[in-house]
Regions:
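Conserved glycine-rich Rossmann-like NAD(P)H-binding loop of the short-chain dehydrogenase/reductase
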Residues: 31-45
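Structural signature of beta-strand start/N-cap positions in the alpha/beta core
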Residues: 6, 32, 57, 82, ...
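Canonical Rossmann dinucleotide-binding motif of NAD(H)/NADP(H)-dependent dehydrogenases/reductases
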Residues: 2-35
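Conserved hydrophobic beta-strands of the Rossmann-like cofactor-binding core
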Residues: 6-10, 83-91
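Conserved Rossmann-fold cofactor-binding substructure of NAD(P)-dependent oxidoreductases
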Residues: 64-78
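Glycine-rich phosphate-binding loop signature in dinucleotide/nucleotide-binding domains
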Residues: 76-81, 135
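Catalytic loop of short-chain dehydrogenase/reductase
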Residues: 11-22, 92-129, 133-177, 186-189
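Rossmann-fold cofactor-recognition segment
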Residues: 49-67
């Protein structure tokens, strides 16, 4: 089903994540994949990458770094020349943006949650756009969580997930004419 497809998968930290299960299934269906990670998590991602049915490389990507995004585009162009799809499994909020004290969250923590968990979908799409053009089409799938409910202690991450949902709609609108599909999948609570 995915024979010959080239997929970028973000967010693999352990072999217990949805992103890891996606990587396994993609390989089972014949896809060629690469993972991304950065910082302290990279060592964990590299360990998980070795447990895949076929071990893969882990590319450096801090999705908030324009330099990393540009380097990702260049490296994917060098290796593959195109990308058929990507999984956005990226989310983060500082500890003070969780925990039930929504009103006391500093603005820089709320902004960090938004930038990493929502705006990053747009940043990844911009980085991959030239590679989807080479492929003639593409798919961007993001992992979501129900943002229609004010979940206890989820706080600013819930706001970021609502922004992620809106971001995906705008990306679908703007990339649809280029044969790029943008969808979110919610794993639920």
């Amino acid at each position: 089903m995915l024979e010959g497809r080239r997929l970028l998968i973000t967010g693999v930290i352990t072999n217990r994540s949805i992103a890891y299960a996606t990587a396994v299934r993609a390989q089972e269906l014949g896809a060629e994949i690469l993972l991304t990670s950065f910082g302290r998590a990279r060592r964990l991602t590299e360990r998980a990458a070795k447990r895949l049915p076929e071990p893969v490389d882990v590319l450096e990507l801090d999705v908030n770094s324009p330099d990393d995004l540009a380097a990702l585009t260049a490296e994917l162009q060098r290796r593959w020349g195109r990308v058929d799809g990507a999984l956005h499994a990226i989310a983060h909020a500082p500890g003070d943006a969780f925990g039930g004290d929504f009103l006391a969250t500093p603005p820089e923590s709320a902004e960090a949650a938004f930038r990493t968990s929502a705006y990053s979908l747009n940043a990844l799409a911009v980085a991959l756009r030239p590679l989807w053009r080479e492929a003639g089409d593409g798919s961007l799938v993001g992992l979501d969580f129900d943002a229609t409910v004010a979940w206890p202690a989820y706080d600013w991450m819930g706001v970021a997930k609502a922004a992620l949902e809106a971001t995906s709609r705008y990306l679908a609108r703007d990339l649809g004419g280029e044969n790029v599909r943008v969808n979110l999948v919610s794993a639920g609570p």
